[in-house]
UniProtKB/Swiss-Prot annotation:
The chain crosses the membrane at residues 13-33, 43-63, 66-86, 102-122. It is found in: Cell membrane. This is High osmolarity signaling protein SHO1. Forms homooligomers. The gene is SHO1. Residues 34-42, 87-101 are extracellular.
C-alpha cells in the first residue's frame, strides 16, 4: 500500500470522475462566491466544502491503492454528499434573479450526478456487469479495482493450479507407496526377521484416511518389525502368532481386504475383533477364526 502516482493515472475512471468533480466544484464555489450572501443559503457552503473533502479523500485512496478497503465507508459519505448537493440545488434553482445562485445550482446538479455515479460504483459488487465494464478500461490488471477480491476467471485459474498441484502430489504419493509396498514384499519373501525401515502405509483411498500427512507416516509403527512377527503370505490361511491382543473392538462397517496387500484382513459389520498396537491408523487385529492381520482404525471401535 505504498504511495504511487501510477495507481491514479492508470485508472481512467478515477481520472475522469475526479476531473469532472473538480470542474463541477469550481462552478459551485464560483457561483457561491458571486451570489448575494444575504440571500444565499449558508448551509450550502458547508455542503460545497464537504464535497471538496470527499474528493480529496478519494484521490488519496487511489494514490495509496486502498480504495477497495474503504468502499463501504465511501458509500456512506457519498450518500451524505448527495443529500447536501440536491438540497442546495433545491434552494438555489428558484432564485432566478441571481445569476451567481443559478451558477452554483448548476454546479450542485453536476456534483449530484457525480455522487450518484460513485455510489453505484463503490456500492456495486466487483463481479457486477457495470463494475466489470468500468474496470475493463483500466490500464492496470486488477490493481486497485477490487484487487483484493479475485474475479471468477482468477478463481477458475487458481482452482486449475490447485488441482494440478494436488494431482502431482497424489501421483507422487501413489508412486512412493507402490515403491514401499514392493520393497516390503521383497523383504518378506527373503526373511521374516529383517526389519523394513520404510513405514508401511496402504489403502489410502479408504474413507477417513484422505487427509493424513507425512508426519502421520513417520509416526506410524513398523508393522513388520521383529517384535510383532506379523508376516502373512496367505490371507486365506488361519494363523495364530501367539501374540497377546489386549483390546476388544467391534467392526463399525464391513471391510474387504486389498487383494494386493497380504497383511490386511477382511471382516463383516458388527464382527468382534481382538486388537492391539492401537497407536496409529492401522491396528493389529485378530478375527474369531484366528486370522491375524491389520485393519483400518476408522472401521472399528474399541469396546469397554
Amino acid at each position: 500500500m505504498s504511495f504511487s502516482i501510477s495507481n491514479f493515472i492508470g485508472d481512467p475512471f478515477a481520472i475522469s470522475t475526479l476531473s469532472f468533480g473538480l470542474i463541477a466544484w469550481i462552478i459551485s464555489i464560483a457561483g457561491a462566491g458571486a451570489s448575494n450572501q444575504d440571500k444565499f443559503p449558508h448551509f450550502s457552503w458547508w455542503g460545497i466544502m464537504y464535497q471538496l473533502v470527499i474528493m480529496v479523500v478519494i484521490t488519496v485512496l487511489y494514490l495509496y491503492n486502498t480504495i477497495e478497503l474503504y468502499k463501504f465507508t465511501l458509500v456512506g459519505l457519498l450518500s451524505i454528499a448527495f443529500v447536501y448537493s440536491t438540497n442546495s440545488t433545491n434552494h438555489l434553482i428558484y432564485k432566478t434573479g441571481d445569476s451567481g445562485m443559478l451558477c452554483c445550482a448548476a454546479g450542485c446538479i453536476l456534483l449530484s450526478m457525480l455522487n450518484l455515479i460513485w455510489i453505484l460504483y463503490f456500492g456495486g459488487h466487483p463481479e457486477s456487469p457495470t463494475n466489470q465494464f468500468i474496470d475493463s478500461f483500466s490500464l492496470k490488471t486488477h490493481s486497485h479495482n477490487h484487487g483484493h477480491l479475485p474475479s471468477a476467471d482468477n478463481k477458475a485459474a487458481d482452482g486449475d493450479i490447485d488441482d494440478e498441484v494436488e494431482y502431482k502430489r497424489y501421483s507422487s504419493s501413489q508412486g512412493n507407496t507402490q515403491f514401499q509396498d514392493n520393497n516390503l514384499r521383497q523383504s518378506q519373501l527373503t526373511t521374516n526377521n529383517k526389519s523394513v525401515n520404510t513405514p508401511y502405509m496402504s489403502s489410502s483411498q479408504l474413507n477417513g484416511l484422505e487427509n493424513f500427512s507425512s508426519s502421520d507416516v513417520h509416526q506410524s509403527r513398523d508393522l513388520t518389525s521383529n517384535k510383532r512377527q506379523t508376516v502373512y503370505n496367505d490371507t486365506n490361511s488361519v494363523n495364530d502368532t501367539g501374540n497377546v491382543f489386549r483390546y476388544k473392538a467391534k467392526a463399525l462397517y464391513s471391510y474387504d481386504a486389498n487383494p494386493e496387500d497380504i497383511n490386511e484382513i477382511s471382516f463383516a459389520k458388527d464382527e468382534l475383533l481382538e486388537v492391539d498396537d492401537i497407536d496409529g491408523k492401522w491396528w493389529q487385529a485378530k478375527r474369531s477364526n484366528g486370522q491375524v492381520g491389520i485393519c483400518p482404525s476408522n472401521y472399528v471401535k474399541l469396546m469397554d
